[in-house]
Amino acid sequence: MLGNPVGVISSSDSQSLERFLNLGYPLSAIDVQRTMAVCAEDGAAAVILALDEETLRKDALQSVSVDVLACDDNGLSDAEVAKLVAKFGCAVGKQTRIAGRTQESDLLAAQAATAYGQTDSRSLSLSIAMVLAAGVRKANIKSALRVSRDLN
């Protein structure tokens, strides 16, 4: 994601860096731990998890530390987001950041989407909001988007 090596765990597309993972869904807590270990061994700096019933079983994130939660529904409060993810065993602590799309992330995503010829930039905007919440500077995000565009 934006220049950092990441893993993705989602029922629609799980991968460790560039390698696709063949997993049986929904994942249990042990499955999540095993998959995250594979991602770490491959050199992933972070793992993006889809928090939905198709991907995860109840309490599948019991021993997982979550730094950033993102929700595409900007109408939800932080407390409502925390309640929604609690069924997966995800504890929202003082260090957890809850991110949602913002005007800033929408603008950056729209600029990048135009360069790629895409019309929908919502998922990119949410990704940008997540890395902003994680503490990545806006200049670094712009640079990563530029490099990504140049590589494509």
Residue ranges and their predicted role:
Residues M1-A110, G117, I128-A134, L151:
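Phosphate-binding loop of NTP-binding sites
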Residues D120-S123:
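Hydrophobic alpha-helical transmembrane segments
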Residues A133-N152:
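Gly/charged, well-structured mid-domain segments that form the phosphate/adenylate-handling core
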